[in-house]
C-alpha cells in the first residue's frame, strides 16, 4: 500500500499516555504506532525506542519524555510518553509537553492504583480538557465481572475529579496483544483512536485568541516614538489597533502605529512572531520588561493566586532543604521577575525537594495573570520549582 504524502491539512492535537507505573503506557504507545503503521498512517516505533526517552530541559528542569507522531483519518497527533512517574508530574506541571487530551491507561488486572488517581488529579489541576480510558491487559482477565468492576471504579474516579465519568469512552483491550498482531486487540487500538478522535476536542488555535504580548525590551526611535519588543503569545495585532499596557502598577492605553519584524514593516503580527510594536504617546520610561501588551479588557493585573507546583530535588539542581510557610522566592512569570510569599495548605508544615503541592502565592505587586499561566520559582538565580496558576484570588 502506498504511503500517503504527509499533508498538513489535518488539524493537529497534542496528547499523551498517563497512568500508574507498569500498567502499559509505553506498550500502548508502541501498539498505536504499530497498528497505524499497517494502515500507512504512522512510522513504526518499537517499545525500546520509546522507553529510552531522551532528556529535555524545560524551565531549568530535566525531564525524560518520548515524542511520537502519527495520524488518524481525521487528525495529526503528537503523542508524549514519559518513562517515570516523577517525569509525568514534572511534565504536566511545567507544561513541557502541552496536552490537549490524554489516554489514561489502567491495567484490568489491578484496577486504579495511587498514580492512576494522582495523574487524573494532575490532569484536572492543569486543565487537560478530556481523558479517554484504555483498560489494558484484558486478555489476562477471564472474569467479565472483574472488567465491569474496574470500569465502574474508573468512572467514579473520573467523576470525583470533575471529568465526565458517565460519558468518557472506556476501551477494553490488550496493548501487548495488539503489538503482537492479534487482530481482535488491533481492532481495539483502532477503536481507541476513534474515541480519541471524537472525544478529545480540537484545541483553540493561538491566533484565534485575544492579542497578548509580554514585553521583553523597550527602546525609543527619535522622532517616531517608543518600540516594545517581544514574542506575541496569542492573537493578532494590526497597525491601528488599540492596546492596553499592564503590570507594575501602572496601566495605560495606547495605539499601535507600526509592526516591525526582521527590520521589515508589516500590516500585522500574529501568535509566535517576534515583533517590535511602535506605540503612540508612550514615553520610554512608562513601559518596561515584564509588562504585558494586550487587547483592552482581556486580562487584569493580580497579586494573589493558587498554583500547582513541583519543587526540584537536590539532584535536579533544586534546594537541598525543605521550605516552610511564608517562604519568599522570586516568581518568573512570562518576562517578569517578581518576589512573592508562599502560603502552604493547612496542615502542611513544610515542602520537601521533589514534592508536588498546591500553594497560595501573594506577589509584592500586581502582574497580568491568567489561569493556566506557567511560571518558574527561582532563588539566588537558579530554578527551584515550576508550576501553573489554577485559581486567581484577588
From Swiss-Prot:
It catalyses: GTP + H2O = GDP + phosphate + H(+). InterPro entries: EF-Tu_GTP-bd, EF-Tu_GTPase, EFTu-like_2, EFTU_2, G_TR_CS, P-loop_NTPase, Small_GTP-bd, T_Tr_GTP-bd_dom. Residues 136-139 are annotated as: G4. Residues 174-176 are annotated as: G5. Residues 10-205 form the tr-type G domain. One of its GO terms (cellular component) is cytosol. The keyword Nucleotide-binding applies. It is an enzyme of class 3 (hydrolase). Keywords: Cytoplasm, Elongation factor, GTP-binding, Hydrolase, Magnesium, Metal-binding, Nucleotide-binding, Protein biosynthesis. Residues 81-84 are annotated as: G3. It is found in: Cytoplasm. Its EC number is 3.6.5.3. Disulfide bonds: none annotated. GTP binds at residues 19-26, 81-85, 136-139. The keyword Cell wall biogenesis/degradation does not apply. It holds the Pfam family GTP_EFTU. GTP hydrolase that promotes the GTP-dependent binding of aminoacyl-tRNA to the A-site of ribosomes during protein biosynthesis. Monomer. Belongs to the TRAFAC class translation factor GTPase superfamily. Classic translation factor GTPase family. EF-Tu/EF-1A subfamily. This is Elongation factor Tu.
Amino acid at each position: 500500500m502506498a504511503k500517503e504524502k504527509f499533508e498538513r491539512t489535518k488539524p493537529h492535537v497534542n496528547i499523551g499516555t498517563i497512568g500508574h507505573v507498569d500498567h502499559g503506557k509505553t506498550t500502548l504507545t508502541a501498539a498505536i504506532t504499530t497498528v497505524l503503521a499497517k494502515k500507512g498512517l504512522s512510522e513504526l516505533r518499537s517499545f525500546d525506542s520509546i522507553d529510552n526517552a531522551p532528556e529535555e530541559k524545560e524551565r531549568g528542569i530535566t525531564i525524560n519524555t518520548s515524542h511520537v507522531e502519527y495520524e488518524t483519518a481525521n487528525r495529526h497527533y503528537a503523542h508524549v510518553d514519559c518513562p517515570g512517574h516523577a517525569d509525568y508530574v514534572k511534565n504536566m506541571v511545567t507544561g513541557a509537553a502541552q496536552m490537549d487530551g490524554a489516554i489514561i491507561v489502567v491495567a484490568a488486572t489491578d484496577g486504579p492504583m495511587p498514580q492512576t488517581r494522582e495523574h487524573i488529579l494532575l490532569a484536572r489541576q492543569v486543565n487537560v480538557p478530556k481523558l479517554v480510558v484504555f483498560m489494558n491487559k484484558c486478555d489476562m482477565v477471564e472474569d467479565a465481572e472483574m472488567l465491569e468492576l474496574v470500569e465502574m471504579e474508573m468512572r467514579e474516579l473520573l467523576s470525583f475529579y470533575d471529568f465526565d465519568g458517565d460519558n468518557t469512552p472506556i476501551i477494553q483491550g490488550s496493548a501487548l496483544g495488539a503489538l503482537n498482531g492479534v487482530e481482535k486487540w488491533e481492532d481495539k487500538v483502532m477503536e481507541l483512536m476513534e474515541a480519541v478522535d471524537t472525544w478529545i476536542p480540537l484545541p483553540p488555535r493561538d491566533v484565534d485568541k485575544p492579542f497578548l504580548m509580554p514585553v521583553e525590551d523597550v527602546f525609543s526611535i527619535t522622532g517616531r516614538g517608543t518600540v516594545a519588543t517581544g514574542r506575541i503569545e496569542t492573537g493578532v495585532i494590526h497597525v491601528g489597533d488599540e492596546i492596553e499596557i499592564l503590570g507594575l502598577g501602572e496601566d495605560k492605553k495606547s495605539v499601535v502605529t507600526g509592526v516591525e519584524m526582521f527590520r521589515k514593516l508589516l500590516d500585522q503580527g500574529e501568535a509566535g512572531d517576534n515583533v517590535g510594536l511602535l506605540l503612540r504617546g508612550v514615553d520610554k520610561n512608562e513601559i518596561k520588561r515584564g509588562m504585558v501588551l494586550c487587547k483592552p479588557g482581556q486580562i487584569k493585573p493580580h497579586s494573589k493566586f493558587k498554583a500547582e507546583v513541583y519543587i526540584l530535588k537536590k539532584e535536579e539542581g533544586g534546594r537541598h532543604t525543605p521550605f516552610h510557610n511564608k517562604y519568599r522566592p522570586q516568581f518568573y512569570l512570562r518576562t517578569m521577575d517578581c518576589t512573592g510569599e508562599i502560603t502552604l495548605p493547612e496542615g502542611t508544615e513544610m515542602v520537601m525537594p521533589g514534592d508536588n503541592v498546591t500553594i497560595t502565592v501573594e506577589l509584592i505587586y500586581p502582574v497580568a495573570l491568567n489561569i493556566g499561566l506557567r511560571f518558574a520559582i527561582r532563588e539566588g538565580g537558579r530554578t527551584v520549582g515550576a508550576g501553573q496558576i489554577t485559581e486567581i484570588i484577588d
